């Protein structure tokens, strides 16, 4: 628990007011309170009514929320209560609520929670309000709101104390509401296509399913080291072996790697697997997910993002990795070449060759990352990744140097990774062993051998198309946000 700091004057006054409430027989931390309306329901129902129409209707309502503004003196006061949907004004008169209730109002501080019952009305200025008949104290805020309660400007505080950001910054609040809606719509889309949502282990004996550095922990009772999952892939494909045919999982994965504007150590992915499908079917599925979210959540195909217009409508561009490199960098990897020839090309083009690079495929990937990625602004499926960097993908039938894999790039960043899954257990074991060798040579993103998964494949897995989407980046795109910390309620902080 954080150390309790010395109370400042405001905090002392608030504690005194809490004591005064106790002395008056009022619980400063109240109990259940039943509302008839939230602020949005009131505005939607009555904003178009005139002051006279509302007076004639003589409607009453019960609202509750956090006190955000308060003004007035003498026997009349105005205030604004804030709930999840917005704000509603309060009009409080001493002769309407009585002395005891008016004292509650007068002594309430900004940040306190109140319940209010009263008449739905409009002021002379035309603002929809609740004319209070009864006030109920619901919770005392012992700390004041941030000084600029209309919006925190200190980003460090916004991330560390997200609750203050949500109270004071409606744009931030709405962004997280949008995130929830996006996730709900992805679920709706997948469920509607016959996929089963499943849950797989977060703790694993071996971290697999991706090239990434895992977090390790120790299970005391079993006395074994375990890894937090870096992907959900291998367990989901075991379910395809088991006959579930169409599965998906939305969940957290963990990678012990660097942090930047688009990377956080724990993040959310959606992975799906479909028996009897291939990577081209999964391209269609991926397009469908993005377009469904565009239609149902933001209501448009053209998104303003990072100073650019991104169009997620229609068919996404599809290009082979080798063709993309040839187009941008002018280097042609279609002709067969030796590793030495590829290394020479790399040096000519200022590409560093790592010690664990053992094939032309590694160098092709480096060319792509250095020269092509940042040029892919509009949604683009890049397919045909080299076998060496795709240990779980099926080899291409026509050219076994490459795999039936794609990545979706938007604005120079990867948004999805998918492939026709490798279902040959002998080939899979060989690729796992090659990864283990790369790990020994210093590639800390390479994985070890998952013998249990190989055994599952030996029981037979049908041809399968698999997909992984980074949910946080997807939310960034659809909310126009350039930092991943702005779409994570509680980002990792030092």
Curated annotation (Swiss-Prot):
GO molecular-function terms, A-Z: ATP binding; catalytic activity, acting on a protein; lysine-tRNA ligase activity; magnesium ion binding; transferase activity; tRNA binding
Family: Belongs to the class-II aminoacyl-tRNA synthetase family.
Entry-linked NCBIfam families: lysS_bact, PRK00484.1
Catalytic activity annotation: tRNA(Lys) + L-lysine + ATP = L-lysyl-tRNA(Lys) + AMP + diphosphate
InterPro entries assigned: Aa-tRNA-synt_II, aa-tRNA-synth_II, aa-tRNA-synth_II/BPL/LPL, Lys-tRNA-ligase_II, Lys-tRNA-ligase_II_N, Lys-tRNA-synth_II_C, NA-bd_OB-fold, NA-bd_OB_tRNA
Protein name (database record): Lysine--tRNA ligase
Cofactor(s) listed: Mg(2+)
Keyword flag Cytoplasm: yes
Any GO BP: lysyl-tRNA aminoacylation
């Amino acid at each position: 628990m954080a150390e309790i700091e010395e109370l400042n004057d405001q905090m002392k006054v608030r504690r005194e007011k809490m004591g005064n409430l106790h002395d008056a027989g009022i619980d400063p931390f109240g109990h259940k309170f039943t509302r008839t309306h939230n602020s949005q329901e009131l505005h939607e129902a009555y904003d178009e009514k005139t002051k006279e129409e509302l007076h004639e209707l003589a409607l009453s309502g019960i609202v509750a929320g956090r006190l955000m503004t308060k003004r007035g003196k003498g026997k009349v006061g105005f205030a604004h209560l804030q709930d999840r949907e917005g704000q509603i004004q309060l009009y409080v008169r001493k002769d309407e609520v009585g002395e005891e209730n008016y004292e509650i109002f007068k002594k309430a501080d900004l940040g306190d929670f109140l319940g209010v019952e009263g008449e739905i009305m409009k002021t002379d200025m035309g603002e929809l309000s609740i004319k209070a008949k009864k006030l109920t104290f619901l919770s005392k805020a012992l700390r004041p709101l941030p000084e600029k309660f209309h919006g925190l400007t200190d980003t460090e505080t916004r991330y560390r104390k997200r609750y203050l950001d949500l109270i004071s910054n409606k744009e931030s609040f709405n962004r997280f509401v949008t995130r929830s809606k996006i996730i709900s719509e992805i679920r709706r889309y997948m469920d509607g296509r016959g996929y089963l949502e499943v849950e797989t282990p977060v703790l694993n004996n071996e971290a697999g399913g991706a090239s990434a550095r895992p977090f390790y922990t120790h299970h005391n009772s079993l006395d074994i080291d375990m890894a937090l999952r870096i992907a959900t892939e291998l367990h989901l494909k075991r379910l395809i072996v088991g006959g579930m045919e169409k599965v998906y999982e939305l969940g957290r994965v963990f990678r012990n790697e660097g942090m930047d504007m688009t990377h956080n150590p724990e993040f959310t992915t959606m992975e799906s697997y479909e028996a009897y499908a291939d990577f081209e079917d999964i391209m269609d599925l991926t397009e469908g997910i993005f377009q469904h979210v565009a239609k149902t959540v933001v209501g448009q195909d053209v998104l303003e993002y990072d100073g650019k217009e991104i169009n997620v409508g229609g068919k996404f561009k599809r290009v082979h990795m080798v063709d993309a490199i040839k187009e941008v960098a002018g280097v042609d990897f279609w002709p067969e070449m030796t590793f030495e020839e590829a290394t020479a090309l790399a040096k000519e083009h200022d590409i560093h060759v790592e010690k664990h690079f053992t094939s032309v495929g590694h160098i092709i990937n480096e060319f792509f990352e250095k020269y092509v990625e940042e040029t892919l602004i509009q949604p683009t499926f890049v397919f045909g990744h080299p076998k060496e960097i795709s240990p779980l993908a099926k080899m291409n039938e026509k050219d076994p140097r490459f795999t039936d894999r794609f990545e979706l790039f938007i604005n120079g960043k990867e948004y999805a990774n998918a492939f026709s899954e490798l279902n040959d257990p002998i080939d899979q074991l060989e690729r796992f062993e090659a990864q283990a060798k790369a790990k020994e040579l210093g590639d800390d993103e390479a994985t070890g051998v998952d013998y249990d998964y190989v055994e599952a494949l030996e029981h037979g897995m049908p041809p399968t198309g698999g997909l992984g989407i980074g949910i946080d980046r997807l939310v960034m795109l659809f909310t126009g946000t350039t930092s991943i910390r702005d779409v994570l309620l509680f980002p990792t902080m030092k």
